[in-house]
A protein has these predicted regions:
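Conserved donor nucleotide-binding strand/loop of the catalytic core
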Residues: 19-48
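Short beta-strand-to-loop acidic/aromatic patch adjacent to the donor-nucleotide binding site
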Residues: 54-63
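A short, conserved alpha-helix in the catalytic core of glycosyltransferases
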Residues: 140, 146-151, 156-183
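Short beta-strand/loop segment that forms part of the nucleotide-sugar
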Residues: 5-13, 31-33
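Acidic donor-diphosphate engagement hotspot in glycosyltransferases and nucleotidyltransferases
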Residues: 18, 42, 69-71, 162
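A conserved acidic beta->alpha catalytic loop
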Residues: 11-20, 64
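A recurrent flexible, glycine/aromatic-enriched loop bordering the glycosyltransferase active site
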Residues: 122-142
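Conserved donor NDP-sugar-binding/catalytic core segment of glycosyltransferases
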Residues: 69-102
Length: 188
């Protein structure tokens, strides 16, 4: 598969021995911080990565595991179209397609879920690439140009809709956000 230049781990206030274990991993670039929510962790990790010499930033949460060729597959599709700013993996839970993304958003009613047109398993399974509006921070490959153009995730959102906000901002900036069917990632 593809060689990864650097792995950045943001330890978001773990108290279960994670800090000590991470401190013993010399091949990792580890950042320890207080728990500032998922959005604060992604904010810090993307901030750190965007200051490095890279073209793409691959984000993951602690409950997802990419298949061996996931990154290679994401890159292959992302490099085919310069408009792709974020390429997301096809997530599986217990061997079945897991979706939480949205194909459209409804921002007209603050009392309803903004994910108006949910991505269905059949959408992902029947198309090589599916355009989405709302993504999850569970494996997206983000073009560094996107970060330079739209900035960092909104850390004030703490744990909810930070990823949807980020992907929507990328789309408003003219990028495509897609799910790549053959880029597999397990979610636990």
């Amino acid at each position: 598969s593809v060689t990864i230049n650097k792995i950045i781990v943001v330890n978001n206030g773990s108290t279960d021995g994670t800090k000590e274990w991470l401190d013993g991993q010399s091949e990792l670039h580890v950042i320890h911080q207080e728990n500032v929510g998922g959005s604060g962790g992604f904010y810090r990790g993307i901030q750190e990565a965007s200051q490095m010499d890279c073209d793409w930033i691959w984000c993951m949460d602690d409950d997802v595991f990419p298949s061996e060729n996931c990154l290679e597959t994401l890159l292959a599709f992302a490099d085919k179209d310069e408009k792709i700013g974020i390429a997301c993996p096809h997530r599986l839970m217990s061997g079945k397609t897991f979706t939480g993304e949205a194909k459209t958003l409804n921002l007209s009613n603050p009392f309803k879920d903004m994910h108006d047109n949910a991505l269905m398993a059949t959408d992902v399974e029947s198309n090589e690439v599916t355009d989405i509006v709302g993504m999850a921070f569970e494996g997206p490959l983000i073009k560094k140009d996107v970060v330079e153009k739209i900035g960092l995730p909104n850390k004030e959102l703490f744990i909810l809709y930070d990823d949807t906000d980020y992907s929507y901002r990328a789309i408003l900036a003219g990028y495509r956000v897609v799910v790549v069917r053959d880029a597999l990632m397990d979610k636990y």
